[in-house]
């Protein structure tokens, strides 16, 4: 599923993402935009450690989920990676919350550091009534 911008903003707000661990809704929206273009079915293979990033937040199989093919995978979210590709983003949101509960928080995502950190993010939630 490819979310419309405001549809995703409202959905993330409903899931309690706005202000979770001090991270504003606009930051989550910016992250999702640059990681997946709001697409729940996005995947990206990393040849370096043979891991894959999954879903709307591009959550990595080395640390967070199990895809059955990543060497030395940890599966800290205790889910199959396929769960991160569903139209229903409940499990993706729960796992993203787990990711940012670690000390580095949202800085775990390279795309956030590259495109969202220290930027004006108002456009990501503008006009969405959130």
From Swiss-Prot:
Spell out the reaction equation it catalyses.
Answer: Hydrolysis of (1->4)-beta-linkages between N-acetylmuramic acid and N-acetyl-D-glucosamine residues in a peptidoglycan and between N-acetyl-D-glucosamine residues in chitodextrins
Keyword annotations of the record:
Antimicrobial, Bacteriolytic enzyme, Disulfide bond, Glycosidase, Hydrolase, Secreted
Compartments it resides in = Secreted
Q: Which Gene3D superfamilies match?
A: 1.10.530.10
Q: Where is the active site?
A: 35, 53
Residue ranges occupied by any C-type lysozyme domain in the UniProt entry = 1-130
Q: Which SUPFAM superfamilies match?
A: Lysozyme-like
Q: Which family does it belong to?
A: Belongs to the glycosyl hydrolase 22 family.
Additional remark text: The sequence shown here is a non-stomach isozyme.
**UniProt protein name:** Lysozyme C, kidney isozyme
């Amino acid at each position: 599923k490819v979310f419309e911008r405001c549809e995703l903003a409202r959905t993330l707000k409903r899931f309690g993402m706005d202000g979770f661990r001090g991270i504003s809704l606009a930051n989550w929206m910016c992250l999702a935009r640059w990681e997946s273009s709001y697409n729940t079915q996005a995947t990206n293979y990393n040849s370096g450690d043979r891991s894959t990033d999954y879903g709307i937040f591009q959550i990595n199989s080395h640390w967070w989920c199990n895809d059955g093919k990543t060497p030395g995978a940890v599966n800290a979210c205790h889910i199959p990676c396929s769960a991160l590709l569903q139209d229903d983003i409940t499990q993706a949101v729960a796992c993203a919350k787990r990711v940012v509960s670690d000390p580095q928080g949202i800085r775990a995502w390279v795309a956030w550091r590259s495109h969202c950190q220290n930027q004006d993010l108002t456009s990501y939630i503008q006009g969405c009534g959130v």
